Amino acid sequence: MGKALIIGCGGVASVAIHKCCQNSEVFEEICIASRTKEKCDALKEKLEGTTKTVIRTAQVDANDVDALIALIRQENPDVVLNLALPYQDLTIMDACLATKTHYVDTANYEPEDTAKFEYKWQWAYRERFEEAGITALLGSGFDPGVTGVFSAYALKHEFDEINYIDILDCNGGDHGYSFATNFNPEINIREVSANGSYWEDGKFIETKPMEIKREYDFEGVGRKDMYLLHHEELESLALNIPGIKRIRFFMTFGESYLTHLKCLENVGMTSIEPIMYEGKEIIPLQFLKAVLPDPATLGPRTVGKTNIGCIFRGKKDGKEKNYYLYNICDHQECYREVGSQAVSYTTGVPAMIGAMLLMNGTWNKPGVHNIEEFDPDPFMDALNRFGLPWKESHDPVLVD
């Protein structure tokens, strides 16, 4: 059917590429491009002979708009799937505009020198993408991504009006390390060490990092402590879900993780301010990333499950209603299928699905759009087909 250019070759990209190759009737050809071409070549070698998808590789600096434009023109893809760093979203969007190519990502733009992510920079491209007749699909991972699809599905099929959304992200996995992150350490630590926030009554209310704690009993995992964080889908859901009064995002963390994180903060290792070290300027957090385990290597040693979903409260036919949509994913099952742990899997599968729905024309809406702005039904069907089956409850335990 078509061709995708996939930028990035980390843990999430590896999953998305595996899933594209399992779906070769749609992804007839892919090009994997990264700053380090050797990683792309190694993945190509691993996959060739197992798929009908034709795989090409390329080297590209995702910070270089001209290089990106040249690569897109050379490969002529139907869609660019951006699985690089959030700092590189805008350069890749610029290249897609210049070449009139559809764009998909999994995380919103964040300036490298400021630990603050929001959609305003990408939403500013709306008119230009619309005029070019191309679509930018923002946030096609799990959270953001599936959480937005869940919200759109709940509104379409279960509610007349949604008033409250609690997004719960639980990782009950154990990788055996004293401290490691399940996705890019730099992005993960910036996210969890920032102030939290939730959206209520038309505005964001800011909290201190890890200030608000709740306990929840997750199916397949058990009771876990979870903490309120700021997360990007709060911003788009507040805009796109009518009737909403409050949205919160909670993520689980173990005591060991939090203790190590506090220690690293106390000695300055989570700082993004440049320092001089032996005559060279380095950023402590980037140095820390270099010495921590690569999330892409955690698959064989991670056991347990993830449970991620949304609890909705609202009204149907004038009556109060509660509803819970969620997915449970097993780390070792993911590893057996694609060589990955479940955190990368739960992001990589939706990334492939979003690209697929643009490529096959199921979703066709020129402009810059968050995922909850599209019909959720094809995406929900694809989740069941491609390894992330969803479950539902009409009588969930609520978060206070």
Regions found by a protein language model. Give the residues of each.
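Glycine-rich Rossmann-fold phosphate-binding loop(s) that bind the pyrophosphate
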Residues: C9-G10
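N-terminal Rossmann-fold NAD(P) dinucleotide-binding loop
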Residues: A13-S14
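Helix N-cap at the beta1-alpha1 junction of Rossmann-like dinucleotide-binding domains, i.e.
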Residues: T36-K39
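Rossmann-fold cofactor-recognition segment
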Residues: T50-D64
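Conserved Rossmann-fold cofactor-binding substructure of NAD(P)-dependent oxidoreductases
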Residues: D61-P77, Q88
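N-terminal Rossmann-like NAD(P) cofactor-binding module of classical short-chain dehydrogenase/reductase
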Residues: I72, D78-N82, Y103-V104
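Rossmann-fold NAD(P)-binding glycine/threonine-rich loop
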Residues: A107-I134
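C-terminal catalytic/substrate-binding lobe primarily of soluble NAD(P)-dependent oxidoreductases
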Residues: K156-D400
